């Protein structure tokens, strides 16, 4: 990114943080595991307590690297919980080290394999409060519960809830898979699950009600929450779930056992640990430095928006007897949870800047010709057969544009939409439909649910005046988070008044949903009534935008998402073939995709 884009430097955030901070006093709590010391201070005229770096598991180091997490043992001495949790081992985004737009997502605390800790914010008078548990995103290769954008003090102070940010292992440390006890896969999900169990057992000491736990997460965090809806061991650990721009069905979020093992074996080869037995290979791998392991993961061959180590769809410990992808289609998931599912208007722009910098890494709004647009679809979706790419070009093109050599903003905008739709939004909408479908089945006279949970859908279109990226990027992937955590209130000097008001409303929606399973404002205008996602309400969404633009809207993206759903259904058929046939090859995938797409293309 060019230096002229760096108009929101890190120093601004540091300065404002110091100005907003009040006098801090120590506070000590008794817990089942031992005494713990945190801090107490006033924020927005409310007394808040923080307990940072609280351990929920034993360190997963040395012989326990790559293995399931172990419960934290009791401690005898006073535990100091005044420093934010370590980040789990990861590489840094070196896109531009002087640009806050990328640096804000890099770990801001020590990076370590010893990282299974929580950060907790609670009102000083907390008693029997709702608990909101945050799952951070980052593609399962980066992220931290301690990023400044995830500071829970504003949410705790204004909504009178307890906020808990959990941590989990990333990359090969959390998702290496060899179908073996030494590398069982989904260790990061097991970390999350253990954190939820810890919260259920210990949050009462902090003033929380273990029966009033809700989870919310973004991107990989949202995909993780969907995994917990499926996992037998996560049942009963939370009542409500908010999924921000992510679902387990997202292509980047989940691998088949075949693909997960393929990547893991490649990593063994890259670091010289491909021994004759898994036991010997893992003994070797546990001796490799974490730095070398993290860097080597990026030498694995990946497609567009494919991440190195992610959730594996079948394993013995987290999903148990279930295949996660099949479970979503067959309704084999927890239906006793209210869901809020949403997407941002400009999900794709963030990824296009990184993946297609020659076209999108610009200060001014990018423009593309129709020829360039077609070529970018071919490269972005190169693993898809020609007929799918042709159908995508047809659906996302402008039939009135006959000059294919003229550059326009329209086609740059369509690249934003096509990447956002395929990799994020359409899977979220499918999950909303799927969840509602099975709720309807279960709430029939012969069904099992007397009071079925509710589903709500949002469409976030608000950009930020403090966003360091150019204005044309809009409401990108991840840029609703600052409003959810009340960043405009914490850093009021760099946000407009209307953005602060909007952030308060977003926090109210989120906290109301966490408390009651329904997103509501305390002072409600008629237009701000959030309709439930159902047939009676014509499956309407809630548009989230400042001013008078918080209002229900008609469902969008129907044609686009119907198309991508047919693609995903055919990919699922290929997945089944790959997993259950001993003679599968990539060519069978392409053949399976091609056969039905004559009919899919003709439908448009």
Curated annotation (Swiss-Prot):
Residues with glycosylation annotation: 96, 128, 274, 299, 400, 446
InterPro entries: AB_hydrolase_fold (IPR029058), AChE-related_enzymes (IPR050654), CarbesteraseB (IPR002018), Carboxylesterase_B_AS (IPR019826), Carboxylesterase_B_CS (IPR019819), Cholinesterase (IPR000997)
Entry's localization field: Synapse; Secreted; Cell membrane
Reactions that this protein is recorded to catalyse: acetylcholine + H2O = choline + acetate + H(+)
Annotated active site: 219 (acyl-ester intermediate), 347 (charge relay system), 477 (charge relay system)
Record keywords: Cell membrane, Disulfide bond, Glycoprotein, Hydrolase, Membrane, Neurotransmitter degradation, Secreted, Serine esterase, Signal, Synapse
Pfam families with a match to the protein in the record: COesterase (PF00135)
Top EC class of this enzyme: hydrolase
Keyword Lipid biosynthesis found: no
Any one GO CC term of the record: plasma membrane
Signal peptide residues on this chain, from the entry's feature table: 1-23
Disulfide bonds: 88-115, 273-284, 426-561
Mode of membrane association: Peripheral membrane protein
EC number: 3.1.1.7
Transmembrane segments: none
GO molecular function: acetylcholinesterase activity
Described function: Rapidly hydrolyzes choline released into the synapse.
PANTHER family: ACETYLCHOLINESTERASE, CARBOXYLIC ESTER HYDROLASE
Similarity-based family: Belongs to the type-B carboxylesterase/lipase family.
Protein name: Acetylcholinesterase 4
Organism: Caenorhabditis briggsae
């Amino acid at each position: 990114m060019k230096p002229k884009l760096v108009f929101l430097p890190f120093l601004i955030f540091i300065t404002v943080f110091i100005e907003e901070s009040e006098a801090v006093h120590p506070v000590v709590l008794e817990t089942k595991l031992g005494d713990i010391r945190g801090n107490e201070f006033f924020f927005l005229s409310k007394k808040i307590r923080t307990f940072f770096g609280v351990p929920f598991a034993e360190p997963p180091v040395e012989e326990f690297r790559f293995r399931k997490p172990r419960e934290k043992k009791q401690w005898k001495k006073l535990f100091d919980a005044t420093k934010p949790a370590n980040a789990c081992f990861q590489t840094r985004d070196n896109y531009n080290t002087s640009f806050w737009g990328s640096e804000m997502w890099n770990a801001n605390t020590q990076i370590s394999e010893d990282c299974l800790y929580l950060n907790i914010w609670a009102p000083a008078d907390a008693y029997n409060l709702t608990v909101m548990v945050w799952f951070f995103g980052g593609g399962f290769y980066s992220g931290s519960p301690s990023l400044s954008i995830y500071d829970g003090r504003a949410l705790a102070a204004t909504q009178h809830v307890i906020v808990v940010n959990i941590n989990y292992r990333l990359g090969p440390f959390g998702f290496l898979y060899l179908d073996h006890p030494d590398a069982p896969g989904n260790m990061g999900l097991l970390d999350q699950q253990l954190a939820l169990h810890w919260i259920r057992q210990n949050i009462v000491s902090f003033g929380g009600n273990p029966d009033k736990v809700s989870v919310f997460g973004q991107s990989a965090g949202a995909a993780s929450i969907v995994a917990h809806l499926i996992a037998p061991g996560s049942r009963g650990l939370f009542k409500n779930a908010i999924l921000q721009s992510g679902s387990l069905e997202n292509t980047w979020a989940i691998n088949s056992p075949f693909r997960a093992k393929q990547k893991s074996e490649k990593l063994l080869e890259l670091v010289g640990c491909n021994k004759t037995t898994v036991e010997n290979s893992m003994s070797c791998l546990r001796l490799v430095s974490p730095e070398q392991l993290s860097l080597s993961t990026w030498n694995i061959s990946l497609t567009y928006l494919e991440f190195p180590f992610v959730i594996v769809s079948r394993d013995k410990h987290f999903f148990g007897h279930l295949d996660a992808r099949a479970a979503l289609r067959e309704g084999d998931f927890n239906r006793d949870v209210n869901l809020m599912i949403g997407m941002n208007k400009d999900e794709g722009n963030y990824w296009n800047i990184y993946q297609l910098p020659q076209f999108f890494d610009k200060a001014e709004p990018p423009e593309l010709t129709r020829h360039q647009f077609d070529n970018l679809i071919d490269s972005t979706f190169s693993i898809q057969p020609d007929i799918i790419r042709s159908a995508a070009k047809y659906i996302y093109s402008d039939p009135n544009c006959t000059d294919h050599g003229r550059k326009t903003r329209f086609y740059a905008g369509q690249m934003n939409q096509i990447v956002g739709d395929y990799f994020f939004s359409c899977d979220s909408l499918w999950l909303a439909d799927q969840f509602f479908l099975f709720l309807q089945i279960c709430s029939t006279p012969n069904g099992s649910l007397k009071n079925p949970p509710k589903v709500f859908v949002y469409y976030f279109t608000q950009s930020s005046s403090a966003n360091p990226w150019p204005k044309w990027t809009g409401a990108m992937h991840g840029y609703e988070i600052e409003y959810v955590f009340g960043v405009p209130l914490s850093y009021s000097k760099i946000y407009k008044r209307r953005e602060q008001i909007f952030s308060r409303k977003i926090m109210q929606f989120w906290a109301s949903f966490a408390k009651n399973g329904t997103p509501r404002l305390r002072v409600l205008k008629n237009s701000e009534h959030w309709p439930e996602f159902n047939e009676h309400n014509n499956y309407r969404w809630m548009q989230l935008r400042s001013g008078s633009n918080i209002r229900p809207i008609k469902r969008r993206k129907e044609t686009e998402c119907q198309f991508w759903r047919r693609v995903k259904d055919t990919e699922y058929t290929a997945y089944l073939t790959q997993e259950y046939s001993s003679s599968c090859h990539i060519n069978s995938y392409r053949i399976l995709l091609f056969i039905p797409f004559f009919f899919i293309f003709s439908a448009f």
